[in-house]
């Protein structure tokens, strides 16, 4: 068993504004906690290579991708939506974030008992096929999934999203695609206020109320996600790993702790060991309380071991 952490310096260079919660300090907090916990000596670390435009086209419309490239500013900021900005380094950061997922898929499919965690930003799961949303420019997890299907000939890829916000972009891209099983747990109502109605048979949404306690969250996952995942028999498990459901994170009102993120990693590891030779790729989504984020990522990685 080996865990590889994939990142890139360019992911630190994307800036969304001084008072924006999606900051480079998020990646620093993860690195600091890896050092503090001694995990830096256990995980293998490597730099991501950027995704190509052709890679991005798999998940997004050509028109949208071309528009993002054309809009990328040489200086200053532009707004893609009320929450999502681009500056001169944002396109490179987004390409390296998406590229990390592609690199991770290639890595874990080369040999069994491999897991990878992509410590990248900007996040991706709110980006729809043709729209930037919620801090997200390109949908990193969708790009990784389609790379696995089209370049590695996989037929069944599971995407598990435990960010406290619904992965509306991933659902938009994959609703009705029987090659994908998408499972998303999230607080509802809460931005983006979607997911309460199931759009397709390959979607398993778990809308849960504010102040959701860990025991309830775990019970719902055991009752709804795991039976679907077992029946699907995935050849690869991808994880949109958002840690903003932590009780210390003020972006929402869940009551989870780092122990819950270790638990979900253990559940996914058992599933992966049974169906896909332990192959798991996780990509960072949300998580904005810096200390809680670092602790939660380390706990999640320990759960994969």
Please give the residue ranges for each predicted region.
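HDAC/HDAC-like amidohydrolase catalytic core signature
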Residues: 1-160, 165-305
């Amino acid at each position: 068993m080996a865990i590889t952490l994939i990142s890139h310096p360019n992911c630190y260079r994307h800036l969304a504004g001084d008072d924006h919660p999606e900051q480079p300090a998020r990646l620093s907090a993860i690195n600091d906690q890896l050092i503090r916990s001694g995990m830096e000596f256990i995980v293998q670390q490597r730099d991501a290579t950027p995704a190509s435009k052709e890679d991005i086209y798999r998940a997004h419309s050509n028109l949208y991708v071309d528009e993002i490239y054309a809009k990328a500013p040489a200086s200053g900021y532009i707004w893609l939506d009320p929450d999502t900005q681009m500056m001169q380094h944002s396109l490179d950061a987004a390409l390296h974030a998406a590229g990390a997922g592609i690199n991770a898929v290639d890595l874990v499919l080369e040999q069994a008992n491999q897991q990878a965690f992509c410590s990248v930003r900007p996040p991706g799961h709110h980006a729809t096929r043709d729209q930037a949303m919620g801090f997200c420019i390109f949908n990193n997890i969708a790009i990784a999934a389609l790379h696995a299907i089209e370049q590695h000939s996989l037929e069944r890829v599971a995407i598990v999203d435990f960010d406290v916000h619904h992965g509306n972009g991933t659902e938009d891209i994959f609703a009705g695609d029987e090659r994908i099983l998408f499972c998303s747990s999230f607080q509802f109502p809460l931005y983006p206020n979607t997911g309460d109605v199931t759009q397709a048979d390959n979607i398993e949404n778990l809308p849960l109320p504010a102040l959701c306690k860990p025991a309830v969250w775990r019970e719902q996952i055991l009752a709804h996600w795991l039976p679907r995942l077992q029946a699907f028999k995935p050849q690869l498990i991808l994880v949109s790993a958002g840690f903003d459901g932590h009780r210390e994170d003020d972006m929402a009102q869940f009551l989870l702790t780092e122990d819950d993120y270790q638990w979900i990693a253990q559940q996914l590891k058992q599933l992966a060991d049974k169906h896909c030779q332990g192959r798991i790729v996780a990509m960072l989504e949300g998580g904005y309380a810096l200390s809680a984020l670092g602790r939660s990522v380390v706990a999640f990685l320990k759960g994969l071991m």
